[in-house]
Amino acid sequence: MPKRTDINTILIIGAGPIIIGQACEFDYSGAQAVKALREEGYKVILVNSNPATIMTDPDMADVTYIEPIQWQTLEKIIEKERPDAILPTMGGQTALNCALALSKNGVLKKYGVELIGATEDAIDKAEDRGRFKDAMTKIGLNTPKSFICHSFEEAWQAQEQVGFPTLIRPSFTMGGSGGGIAYNRDEFQAICERGFEASPTHELLIEQSVLGWKEYEMEVVRDKADNCIIVCSIENFDPMGVHTGDSITVAPAQTLTDKEYQIMRNASLAVLREIGVDTGGSNVQFAINPANGEMIVIEMNPRVSRSSALASKATGFPIAKVAAKLAVGYTLNELRNDITGGLIPTSFEPTIDYVVTKVPRFAFEKFPQADDRLTTQMKSVGEVMAMGRTFQESLQKALRGLEIGICGFNLRSESPETIRRELANPGPNRILYVADAFGAGFSLEEVHHYSKIDPWFLIQIQDLVQEEMALEKRAFTELDYAELRRLKRKGFSDKRIAQLIKVSESDVRAKRYALNLHPVYKRVDTCAGEFKADTAYLYSTYEDECEAKPTTRQKVMILGGGPNRIGQGIEFDYCCVHAALALREAGFETIMVNCNPETVSTDFDTSDRLYFEPLTLEDVLEIIYKEQPWGVIVHYGGQTPLKLAHALEQNGVNIIGTSADSIDAAEDRARFQKILTDLGLKQPNNRTARNAEEAVKLAEEVGYPLVVRPSYVLGGRAMQIVYNVDELNNYMQEAVSVSNDSPILLDHFLKNAIEVDVDCICDSEQVLIGGIMQHVEQAGIHSGDSACSLPAYSLTNEVQGEIRRQTSAMAFALGVKGLMNVQFAVQNETIYVLEVNPRASRTVPFVSKATGNPLAKIAALVMAGKSLAEQNATTEIIPPYFSVKEAVFPFIKFPGVDTTLSPEMRSTGEVMGTGQSFAEAYYKAQLGAGERIPSTGKVFLSIADEDKPQIIRVAQYLQAEGYGLCATIGTAQYLRENGVGVQIINKVREGRPNIVDSIKNNEIAMIINTVNNLPESIKEAQEIRRNALKLHIPTYTTLAAAEAISEAVRHINKYDVNALQQLHLSSALANQITR
């Protein structure tokens, strides 16, 4: 059946900002869908609020809107663009919920728009817990005993029926948001409160516990002719009770019998048919009782998902691309398999002859107050995937790819009590405790009893632990070719072997090279070698035949960023993708190395050759040994590849672009200070301390308050502002573990300074200023957590001119060749240099979208030898409109965590708003970030004494827009003295009713709360913010943010939507750019 010709224009809804439960896998799927539909001649309109995505590049879709993903904004776009259809299955839960809201509010009917890929009824049937349960009963599939509830009374009645422990699952949420497992009445009440709030339909499923059952997933694709295929089966290493996004998962399923697999396969197809998913991909989750084999259906997602991105990367089958084409009428047998060069149709089920393991990455170090126990609400921020011929090999490769300081199991001496507790109550490191248990002499039965992990997996880990313990007793000289090869086949890294045998990693590598023992590379081909693979999608293993077949072309290798984490996320992958595309266009063969299954960089057609490998020195050197690239780029993947720069250079690798020595000159405090002194540039007063005693002494010289941090970190890891010697001593005790024997840096903290970010490109002869961004939050808030505006909204032209001059001077002095980011602080018109990073920064995608200048692409060509002049890229573009980037935080996933901002980065993603004024752009950025900004109601003000003079104007603006004001007594008296009418409200410690009572009673619409450094003020402010977070009340904790929102509220419901291509055209005309 050919594609549909009755529709011409299709709108795709993206997933919005990166949040826990919905990450960059939707950029991967959305980008595939856009390309697939344009390939078929459809006009594609894309809506997404996330500027760090490849899918929002102006040359991806025909028309691109970087706008808030809410139905009111979508209606404005639909009215303007008049699409024939909407594809809502590529943007996760956000897109599905938005599509349903468009339908519910009559927008689809009003403009005659149809949903393709999944009908409204199919979405509702899959997402509505009650309807889904009824559908499963109808087709004879069991589900856990459960009840749909819309009130606390119903919830308690249901709980009595199912007993404890009780699972609570809200409807229409992602990543298990709002859900959890309750073991007692207090926990049940708390989780239900959270769940009702999280569910847009105020609906919960109260479900019997199936904790300890084995969990499986099936990735299914179906077309309109009822052809169905299973792309991949996935088994969760962790049993039921841990969200699948937080579980280690393995593909294909390892412990199913063939009979069980066929039953599950047939059930999956029956689920899709009953729900009504007739074009596209879905994910169906099952649980099996290990005691008797009983199988139940847990849930299904009628869209591409996190698991489908994993299945696509695991098999090479492009689920999103195929699903997009099925949505416009094709059938599976009409589409061809790209990996095999079109030799076979996509109706052939993929077959894999290797094992894929995904391990999640967590960020609890950023949220010390958070509960780190894993439940049905997802908490991981990223993941790593590895392939090997066995589970053992792929697991060990995945563990070293996590970049958490381990290169294998790294056994620890934990107490038996700790081990039992960690096995029974899973946390982020449970797999390491499994190994610790075997190392401590626990039996297989004991470990299974406490963890409920399938014995087959435990046997594999027990064997690896026994290998480690035996290796510790061996002499290095005893390791011959056969023994070393046997260990490598089980996934042991050179570094881990070296640690166990007490030699250096380079000793092991030298011995391996002397024995001519190298990995071979196998191709991911979807067909287990039955047909020739046309694409070079490769993984390493220790076997005989190598399928890499390297070419003799001039090659550039790009090292990716590894797993997402706070401080290093999709922005760096964006840069890697642009480097690959630009260099390929310039005639180079591009080689991508990465291990993150969520990303566009690990799509098999982004680069010429893809190596899905951990980003360790050993793994990278082996690929270089095989491929012999002309140059390697380490500047685009964040701190991960940068840490390898010196070692790669020492091994004779040609690092193109800025040299490792220049990177070190920017990071090394003494060297960098000398450069600034020579240039006559200012830095905040600072010193470097190597121990606690020295820090205390030097702090007196610098003067409090201080910004303290370890050297060589990304994302402000362990960065803090300290106000006195006691706080400094506390910091020194806690921060030593993250300092890597590097010194602690002490900088004088510049109060009330404006922070400024600059991205630029230097080619040794000229400097292109990419953009000057003014932060909304003052210096002292991590740049990744602050909102910022391009162009600057209050800096004078003189200050901006001087910033440009200083940026250029530093780029030349450091010998930068490629991208560079500088952070300045401006205090009373005086400019201070905070730090310089001669690499890609997390603001590069935002600057590129805001200006239309593709910085990552231009810089990649500079690194390969093409000057800025040759690219006609020497003119800074200053747009005639404002773009605001706003950070998005995961606080809702971590009840109890304080939401105040600090020098340590805690945001997971970002959004962008555009407007003719800063206020309009800021308002749209707040909407995009999910803030529910009220148009009326009462604003609560509690302001630190030093901030009170500036709050008067904020209060006046808010009052002029019709808001009521209430404040604590000190703030209220100050405002009244300055002519602002305000109601007085009690602080928490001043009696009842107080501000927290008012918050809980829904009497407060917005909160502006700045805090002094007194312990009682900090504690009270935390309670205010914690309660506000529960009820989604917008809260602003800095004066600058308060000023911005007081201006932004004028634009409530009065904003325009702007196509990115039109914005860039207006920018080019304003700047007379002809390129």
UniProtKB/Swiss-Prot annotation:
Residue span, ATP-grasp domain: 133-328, 673-864
Domain MGS-like: 931-1070
Enzyme class of the recorded protein, top EC level: ligase
Cofactor: Mg(2+); Mn(2+)
Amino-acid positions noted as binding Mn(2+) 3 in the UniProt annotation, renumbered to this chain: 823, 835
Binding site for Mg(2+) 4: 835, 837
Binding site for Mn(2+) 4: 835, 837
Note on cofactor: Binds 4 Mg(2+) or Mn(2+) ions per subunit.
Any one GO MF annotation of this record: metal ion binding
A GO CC term assigned to this protein in UniProt: cytoplasm
Binding site for ATP 2: 709, 748, 750, 755, 780-783, 823, 835
Protein name: Carbamoyl phosphate synthase large chain
Natural source organism: Haemophilus ducreyi (strain 35000HP / ATCC 700724)
